[in-house]
Regions:
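C-terminal catalytic/acceptor-binding lobe
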Residues: 184-193, 205-297
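Short beta-strand/loop segment that forms part of the nucleotide-sugar
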Residues: 36-51, 82-83
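Active-site beta-to-alpha loop of glycosyltransferases that engages the nucleotide-sugar donor
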Residues: 8-20, 48-50, 87
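Short, well-formed alpha-helical segments that are part of the catalytic scaffolds
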Residues: 14-30, 56-57
Length: 297
């Protein structure tokens, strides 16, 4: 039996989105059975250097209370960060992949998904070995680089349909699933937190370097490093579930209490710093892999 860990990182301003996500997650867990071993790891990040609690009208306890009631009956190893030990979702992923699970699902708080999604992903993942990724499909995303993941019913739609059409956006929750084809794509393409499932061996292989810090482009790094490995003959599979899609919620992003907390927004600073190191990290990974590859007898 494969053990699966679902990893979600929650900032205070995301608690309302996360509550909506958990409604779907509770439904999704109802389709699990005795052959499934699925655990949630949700990190509520109340780091005082990411939120100015002294200047915030509502305090940490408010979020702890809202958070704590969301998991009744769901197996979890959740954590609440009250100090400066966690700086973002990239760090949470880096720490999570070291835990003794066979595979991981990374999911952002703004993801809208069908209640059957988890069941479909698990069923496909149980048939795979080695390094693999199992992705939902997407309605037409930003540009043609995402075409490999496009749901078969949306291939002729304009780019941006997932963001511009609210019926499509929120339809992710109630979409009619007519058929699903688990198809392998010839490359790697994923958004790290798009309810994407990864084998532990994939992240052990490419890693999430410390240099990417608390918040950075670990998805780009993982994709590009994986592509290098595939060119050298390493077997990394990405399977797309063509027939069931996810979207991001571009509408309900601002919480009702937004004027009552004072975020200290370091995401751009963290991302820019990490992104500036990204190419060198990929080159370093490629160099080591090529050296290892050419050294083989």
């Amino acid at each position: 039996m494969k053990k699966t860990l679902i990893c979600i990182h929650v900032m205070p301003s995301e608690i309302e989105m996360f509550e909506r996500l958990m409604i779907q997650m509770h439904k999704a867990f109802q389709y699990l059975n005795e052959n499934d071993d699925v655990t949630l790891k949700v990190t509520l990040n109340l780091n005082p250097e990411l939120t100015d609690w002294k200047e915030s009208e509502i305090k940490q306890g408010y979020f702890v209370s809202r958070f704590g009631v969301l998991f009744n009956g769901l197996k979890n190893i959740n954590e609440v960060i009250l100090d400066t030990s966690c700086w973002g979702t990239t760090q949470q992923k880096r720490e999570s992949i070291k835990l003794p699970y066979d595979q991981f699902i990374f999911c952002d708080t703004d993801i809208l998904f069908h209640e059957h999604m988890l069941r479909y992903q698990l069923d496909v993942s149980y048939q795979l070995n080695g390094m693999y990724i199992v992705s939902p499909s997407l309605p037409k995303w930003w540009d043609n680089s995402w075409d490999y993941l496009t749901h078969y019913e949306y291939k002729d739609k304009p780019y941006g349909t997932a963001m511009d059409d609210k019926d499509v956006m929120f339809g992710a929750l109630t979409q009619e699933i007519k058929q699903i084809t688990a198809r392998q794509i010839p490359t790697l393409k994923f958004g790290c937190g798009m309810h994407t499932l990864y084998s532990k061996s994939f992240w052990e292989f490419v890693t999430i370097p410390d240099e990417l810090g608390g918040y950075g482009p670990e998805d780009t790094y993982g994709m590009e490093s994986g592509k290098v490995a595939m060119k050298l003959g390493y077997d990394i599979k990405q399977i797309v579930l063509d027939g069931v899609y996810i979207t991001e919620d571009y509408v309900n992003r601002t919480p009702k209490f937004s004027d009552m907390i004072k975020p200290i927004d370091k995401k751009k600073e963290f991302y820019d710093t990490a992104n500036s190191k990204g190419q060198e990290l990929i080159k370093s990974f490629a160099k080591k892999l090529i050296e290892k590859h050419t050294a083989k007898p």
